[in-house]
Amino acid sequence: MSQITPTTYEEFLALAAEGTVVPLVKTVMADLLTPVSAFLRIERQSPRAFLLESVEGGEKIARYSFLGCAPHTIVRARGSQVFIERANGNQETLQRPMLDVLRDLMREHKPVKVAGLPPFSCGAV
C-alpha cells in the first residue's frame, strides 16, 4: 500500500502557508528495490539525477538514501568564481566566496517540518 503525505490538497496548502518548501512524500513498499536500482530508473528520465547515500554514522545518520532529479538550482565553483544555474535557464557568475553564496541561496527557502518525516526530508544537497 502506498500513501502520499500530505494526504489532502487542503493540508498541503496549510503547510505551504508556513514556508516556501513543502516535502511531498510517497511511501511505497520496495523490498526488492535498492537505492542504486531506483537511481538507475530515475537516471533514464533525467540527466541530472543523483543518488546520495549515508553509510557511516549509525542509525541516526547512516540509514538514508537521497534520490533526486531535475534540480531547481545548480551551484558550481571554480577558483574564485561561483556559477549559478536555475531550472528556468537563468545563469549568473559571481566573484564571492562559495559559502556566502550558498548561505544567500538557502535564505530564499524555508522548508516546512512535517510530523513523522526524518529530520532531513527536503532541501539542498
Q: Across the structure, where does each feature detected by a protein language model lie?
A:
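Signature of the chorismate-utilizing enzyme
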Residues: 1-125
